[in-house]
């Protein structure tokens, strides 16, 4: 966190009752493949005012994953894949364990989202409105509920059944959400991963390649929905998501962000799979409802991309330069103070 958030009462009403000061909030979710530098960028943004406004930072819930409970989920999910590859764990058992660990990644994000989403206010403002407060989150729930499970599914570490179950937990985003998908060239990405050498974490190039593609799909999904289209547009002509599709999705940068994407460039394409279709090749209604829900939950998210190849300060400046393009909401000073308290508590409890 940087400077204190806007607080106090701006004026009193005609009756003499205090009127809460209005506060314009920009909220940013830094996301992307692990090890790029988003956490460092978020901390730097919080160490000084972003665009002149106070900045709060909510870090990754590392303690929740590693020390608060009996199992370290980061070490556990990688160890599960190692045991499968060594023949010590059957593929079906490994898939079930992987899904369990992936759900553990999601829990703290869902809790945090539930606690904070009502504090941002419901009135969306014109893009370019100067914020009174910038709130930076280290990942959105879409990371652990959709993107990472999707990558695990495409690799073969999780089933479609488990993926759909995870996707269903994604909370609906209120107006004003901004995701910045952080990117980096592959060589520098690997160098940074080796430098940080996080305990239990592995440099899994297949997972990294797949995640890069999935995050491109996320950006394309946002662009697709922003154009006014829905997942049913072009569904009939979309080919099945078969082993060829999965193989392509694991190849480095096989998917790229597109300003005018087709349905095949989006996250929705991977769900046209036999497990979700009837004997005629028609998607079952219950699964169609799941895709409807996913579409509604993603619709209020604006997705941006930012290259983090510079110094930490340069990376923070890159993200800050996007703020005039971002959505913002109108809240009040009491909610802003609640966000400040929440950020202070989350930082204190989630550090390891």
Curated annotation (Swiss-Prot):
<feature type="active site" description="Proton acceptor">
    <location>
        <position position="60"/>
    </location>
</feature>
<feature type="binding site">
    <location>
        <position position="192"/>
    </location>
    <ligand>
        <name>ATP</name>
    </ligand>
</feature>
<dbReference type="InterPro" id="IPR001889">
    <property type="entry name" value="Herpes_TK"/>
</dbReference>
<keyword id="KW-0547">Nucleotide-binding</keyword>
<feature type="binding site">
    <location>
        <position position="78"/>
    </location>
    <ligand>
        <name>substrate</name>
    </ligand>
</feature>
<dbReference type="GO" id="GO:0005524">
    <property type="term" value="F:ATP binding"/>
</dbReference>
<comment type="subunit">
    <text>Homodimer.</text>
</comment>
<feature type="binding site">
    <location>
        <position position="198"/>
    </location>
    <ligand>
        <name>substrate</name>
    </ligand>
</feature>
<dbReference type="Pfam" id="PF00693">
    <property type="entry name" value="Herpes_TK"/>
</dbReference>
<feature type="binding site">
    <location>
        <position position="102"/>
    </location>
    <ligand>
        <name>substrate</name>
    </ligand>
</feature>
<dbReference type="GO" id="GO:0006230">
    <property type="term" value="P:TMP biosynthetic process"/>
</dbReference>
<keyword id="KW-0418">Kinase</keyword>
<protein>
    <recommendedName>
        <fullName>Thymidine kinase</fullName>
        <ecNumber>2.7.1.21</ecNumber>
    </recommendedName>
</protein>
<comment type="function">
    <text>Catalyzes the transfer of the gamma-phospho group of ATP to thymidine to generate dTMP in the salvage pathway of pyrimidine synthesis. The dTMP serves as a substrate for DNA polymerase during viral DNA replication. Allows the virus to be reactivated and to grow in non-proliferative cells lacking a high concentration of phosphorylated nucleic acid precursors.</text>
</comment>
<dbReference type="GO" id="GO:0004797">
    <property type="term" value="F:thymidine kinase activity"/>
</dbReference>
<dbReference type="InterPro" id="IPR027417">
    <property type="entry name" value="P-loop_NTPase"/>
</dbReference>
<keyword id="KW-0067">ATP-binding</keyword>
<keyword id="KW-0808">Transferase</keyword>
<feature type="binding site">
    <location>
        <begin position="32"/>
        <end position="39"/>
    </location>
    <ligand>
        <name>ATP</name>
    </ligand>
</feature>
<comment type="similarity">
    <text>Belongs to the herpesviridae thymidine kinase family.</text>
</comment>
<keyword id="KW-0237">DNA synthesis</keyword>
<keyword id="KW-0244">Early protein</keyword>
<dbReference type="GO" id="GO:0071897">
    <property type="term" value="P:DNA biosynthetic process"/>
</dbReference>
């Amino acid at each position: 966190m940087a400077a204190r958030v806007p607080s106090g009462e701006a004026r009193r009403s005609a009756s003499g009752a205090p009127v809460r000061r209005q506060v314009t909030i920009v909220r940013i979710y830094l996301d992307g493949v692990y090890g790029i530098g988003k956490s460092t960028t978020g901390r730097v943004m919080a160490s000084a005012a972003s665009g002149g406004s106070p900045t709060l930072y909510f870090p990754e819930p590392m303690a929740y994953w590693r020390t608060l409970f009996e199992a370290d989920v980061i070490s556990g999910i990688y160890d599960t894949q190692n045991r499968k590859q060594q023949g010590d764990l059957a593929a079906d058992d490994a898939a079930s364990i992987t899904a369990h660990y992936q759900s553990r990644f999601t829990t703290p994000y869902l809790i945090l989202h539930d606690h904070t989403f009502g504090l941002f206010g419901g009135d969306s403002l014109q893009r370019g409105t100067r914020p009174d407060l910038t709130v930076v989150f280290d990942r959105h729930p879409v990371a652990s509920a959709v993107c990472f499970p999707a990558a695990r599914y495409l690799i073969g570490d999780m089933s479609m059944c488990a993926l759909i179950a995870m996707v269903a937990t994604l909370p609906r985003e209120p107006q004003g959400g901004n995701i910045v998908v952080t990117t980096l060239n592959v060589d520098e990405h690997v160098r940074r991963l080796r430098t940080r050498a996080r305990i239990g974490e592995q440099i899994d190039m297949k997972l990294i390649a797949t995640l890069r593609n999935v995050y491109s799909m996320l950006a394309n999904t946002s662009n697709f929905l922003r154009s006014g289209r829905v997942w049913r547009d072009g569904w009939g002509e979309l080919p099945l998501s078969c082993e060829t599709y999965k193989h392509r999705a694991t190849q480095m940068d096989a998917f790229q962000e597109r300003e005018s994407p087709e349905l095949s460039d989006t996250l929705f394409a991977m769900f046209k799979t036999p497990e979700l279709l009837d004997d005629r090749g028609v998607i079952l209604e219950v699964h169609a409802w799941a895709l409807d829900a996913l579409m509604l939950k993603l619709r209020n998210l604006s997705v941006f991309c930012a290259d983090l190849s510079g110094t930490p300060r340069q990376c923070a400046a890159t993200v800050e330069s996007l703020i005039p393009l971002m959505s913002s909401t109108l809240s009040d000073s009491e909610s802003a103070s609640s966000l400040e308290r929440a950020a202070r508590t989350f930082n204190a409890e989630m550090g390891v």
